[in-house]
Amino acid sequence: MNNFITLPYKLEREAPPFEANAIKYPESLVRHFLHLYTKRGDKVFDPFAGLGTTLFVAEDMGRIPFGMEYDPKRYEWVAGQLQHWTNLIHGDSGRVAAQGFPKMDFCMTSPPFMAKNHQWNPLYAGDPSKAGYAKYLSRMKAIYRQIATIMKRDAMMVVQCDNLPGRVYTPLVRDLSLTLSQVLKLENEIIVAWDGGKKDYRHTHCLIFKNR
């Protein structure tokens, strides 16, 4: 498997009126992995649906999208544009195993990022009792342990993530690969160079896992 690819950086779908497109990855990234790992009719899951890029592209390519989204505005905006809108659940991905999802063929997402020197934990909506980077990584492992139960055996799972510069550097790619490989089999790390990307965002990382 090639561990370095180049894809066009173009955000094709307009952002919703309530926020910019800063949280989404380009549609080209989803197309690449759907071509690589899925076929028409396959069930594609995104546990952190965000602005719906994975789900929209999956539906456009004849796959069946499923997902979860915690933010009510994002959920309503995405669900309102999906043909399979009932497959998107408004709720906490930490409860994915309780939603009654069918077995999935493929999973792709960009989870909420967290810097190691921050206390506000996006996976707990900032609950002070769940603050800190260690609890973030622990929660991410627990979420993917649940996701594994709704995936078919040997199903491929892609996690897009970036290292976070700043006053304290966060090696998020390394930390997520080590954390999630405790519940999934790490197959590869693919570096994606952006053709036409922003000056401060020339590449990203995709961790490739296989369900055990």
What is each of the regions a protein language model found here?
Residues M1-R212:
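Class I S-adenosyl-L-methionine-dependent methyltransferase catalytic core
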